[in-house]
Amino acid sequence: MPPKKKKVTGLIKLQIKAGAANPAPPVGPALGQHGVNIMEFCKAYNAATESQRGMVVPVEITVYEDRSFTFVTKTPPAARLILKHAGIEKGSGEPHKTKVANVTRDQVREIATIKMPDLNANDLDAAEKIIAGTARSMGVTVEG
């Protein structure tokens, strides 16, 4: 007989800086209410995201009945990647009136390539359109 599947008791989605997870909020309270060993998660997450230090990396944590957990890291949010490539701190407060920066078509393609595993797109062109739309809604113009 195949081994019995563990029963899932919770799914937690967080956005944490890579290599900088610690038991302080928001990580501690989110995991604590599900009875997960917080330090164990922090060590595992920090080890898994060490190479992406400085970026915000979303994580999806699945908590099981026996309080064990598994987690899947995602690609950094598109908005963060756009800000990084445009070299700005934050997007425009009035995106359709005030433009704050420019990104080239090549930069959009690069971001789309990075985000491809997490995007709901069939090919790179569709992914580029999604990223360009995100850039426009942040007040960043796409050149080319």
From Swiss-Prot:
Keywords: Methylation, Ribonucleoprotein, Ribosomal protein, RNA-binding, rRNA-binding. One of its GO terms (molecular function) is structural constituent of ribosome. The keyword Transcription regulation does not apply. One of its GO terms (biological process) is translation. InterPro entries: Ribosomal_uL11 (IPR000911), Ribosomal_uL11_bac-typ (IPR006519), Ribosomal_uL11_C (IPR020783), Ribosomal_uL11_C_sf (IPR036769), Ribosomal_uL11_CS (IPR020785), Ribosomal_uL11_N (IPR020784), Ribosomal_uL11_N_sf (IPR036796). One or more lysine residues are methylated. GO terms for cellular component: cytosolic large ribosomal subunit. The keyword Ribonucleoprotein applies. It holds the Pfam family Ribosomal_L11. Forms part of the ribosomal stalk which helps the ribosome interact with GTP-bound translation factors. PANTHER family: 60S RIBOSOMAL PROTEIN L12 (PTHR11661), LARGE RIBOSOMAL SUBUNIT PROTEIN UL11M (PTHR11661:SF1). Belongs to the universal ribosomal protein uL11 family. Part of the ribosomal stalk of the 50S ribosomal subunit. Interacts with L10 and the large rRNA to form the base of the stalk. L10 forms an elongated spine to which L12 dimers bind in a sequential fashion forming a multimeric L10(L12)X complex. NCBIfam families: L11_bact. This is Large ribosomal subunit protein uL11. It comes from Streptomyces sp. (strain FRI-5).
